[in-house]
Amino acid sequence: MSNVTSSKATPSSGKAPEQAKVENIRGVFSTQEIRRVGTGTTTRKTVQKTFWFIDQQPDGSIESQPLNANYVPTGAKRKISMEDLINKFAPEPEFYLNSVYPKMQELQRTIESGDEHREKGETFAAEYEYTTALKVDEDNVRANFGIGLTYLQRGESDKAEDIFQRLVKLDAAFEQEHKHLFNDFGISLRKNKMLKQAVEYYGRALELTENDENLHMNMARALMEIKDYEQCTQHLIKGLELNPEHEPTLRFLSWLQQKSLVPADQQDAVSALLKAYAPQETQTATDGQADG
C-alpha cells in the first residue's frame, strides 16, 4: 500500500480500458526541522524528523495528524494544502506498510472488541480492551467514549468523571463522525445524575458548534433537571431560531409553558414562538424523545 496510488481497470473482451484513476492520498509522510543546539564554538546542528499520517478527504482537503511513540496517529488533525504536502513532506511508504498500518489495524480491532463486549453487557471484558487501546493511544476518542460508557453502565461515577474530564478537552470528541457516541455519553451522564457534568459537556460542544438545534435541545434537558428553567428556556428558544419546525423543541417548550415553568420575562417570546410554529395538537410529554 503506497501513499499515492493509481489503478487502471483490467480490459475485458469487447470493452475499452478505463482511464487511470488516482486514489486519495493516505499514508505516512515525514518532515524535517534543523535546529541549532549550544552556543559559540559548541554550536551544532541537529535534524529533528517528525512523522505524520496524511489522509485526503473525499472533498479533496488534506488532513495531517502526528504519530505517537507507538506509531499510531493521535492528537489534533490539521488541514494542509497540496502545495505544502509536496514541498514540505516526504513520503514514507515502507514505514507505513511495515509499522504504522499494522499498528492502526491492531488498535482498531481492540476497540471493536471492546465495543462488542460493552454491547453484550460484558463490562469488565470491555474495560480490559479499552484500557489496552488507551495504552497505545491515550487520546483515542472511540476508546475514551467506550470506557466512559462502560463505567457509566456499571454506575461507577468517579471513574466516569475522570474520563469525562479527558473527553471535554478533546476537540475531536465533538466531531460529526463521533455523533452517535457523543449522544450516548450525554444520555448516560444524565441517567447517572451527573447533571453538572452533562451541562458542561453540552456547553463544550456548543463552543465548537453553536448552530445545532439538537445540541440546544439536549442542553435544555440537562438544565431542566437541575431546575435552571431560565437557561433551559433560552436554549430552546435558540434551537427554534435555528430550526422553527423542530418538533421535539416545540413539544418541550409547550410542556414548560403548560407546567408554568417558563420565567415571566420569557413568556411573551415563548407564546409568540408556539403560536407561530407549534401544531394545534402539540404533544406535552418530553419523556422518551430521542436525543439528536
Where are these regions (language model features)?
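Structural signature of tandem alpha-helical TPR/SEL1-like repeats
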Residues: G121-Y128, R154-R166, N192-R204, I226-K238, ...
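Long, contiguous interaction/recruitment modules in multidomain scaffold/adaptor proteins
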Residues: S2-T132, V136, K159-D162
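Alpha-helical adaptor scaffolds
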Residues: R142-R221, E225
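Terminal, low-structured helical/coil segments at or just beyond the last alpha-helical repeat
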Residues: T233, I237-G292
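Structural marker of alpha-solenoid helical repeat scaffolds
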Residues: V136, L170-F174, L208, L242, ...
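Generic detector of contiguous secondary-structure segments
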Residues: P11-A16, E138-E156, L236-K238
